[in-house]
């Protein structure tokens, strides 16, 4: 069976892994998934990520907990293959009043909503993380 939305699968693996208190989760690797993992690490939502170079590359994400509770409260896919969501620089959403982040795909690469606003760029809203 082919995977229709690999990004939604990645976010679901992170959500389920934290609900089950796993130390890390693994998934098939892709450039966009690595960019999302890098952004999540920079924002402090995951501890680390690594790509294992095998016949089929595997992305391993080390999950982060604070006092036994998952750091990621919600992680939600916004733009999907059947319905792409694009926002201009003035329309970019603030997740939880600025406490969370929206990951946005711009012409300059993947970045948070804050960075995109500072650079005066809009783009495709990939997901919300809080």
From Swiss-Prot:
Record GO biological process: translation
GO cellular component: ribonucleoprotein complex; ribosome
Keywords: Ribonucleoprotein, Ribosomal protein, RNA-binding, rRNA-binding
A GO molecular-function annotation: rRNA binding
Gene3D superfamilies: 3.30.1370.30, 3.30.1490.10
Family: Belongs to the universal ribosomal protein uS8 family.
Role: One of the primary rRNA binding proteins, it binds directly to 16S rRNA central domain where it helps coordinate assembly of the platform of the 30S subunit.
Quaternary structure annotation from Swiss-Prot or TrEMBL: Part of the 30S ribosomal subunit. Contacts proteins S5 and S12.
UniProt protein name: Small ribosomal subunit protein uS8
Protein's gene: rpsH
């Amino acid at each position: 069976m082919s995977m229709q939305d690999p990004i939604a699968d990645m976010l679901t693996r992170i959500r389920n892994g934290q609900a089950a208190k796993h130390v890390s989760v693994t998934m098939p690797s892709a450039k966009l998934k690595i960019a999302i993992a890098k952004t999540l690490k920079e924002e402090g939502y995951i501890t680390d990520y690594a790509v294992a170079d095998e016949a089929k590359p595997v992305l391993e994400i080390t999950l982060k907990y604070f006092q036994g509770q998952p750091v990621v409260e919600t992680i939600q896919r916004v733009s999907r293959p059947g319905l792409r969501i694009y926002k201009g620089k003035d329309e970019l959403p603030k997740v939880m009043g600025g406490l969370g982040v929206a990951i946005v795909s711009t012409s300059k690469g993947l970045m948070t909503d804050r960075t995109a606003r500072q650079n005066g760029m809009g783009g495709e809203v990939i997901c919300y993380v809080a």
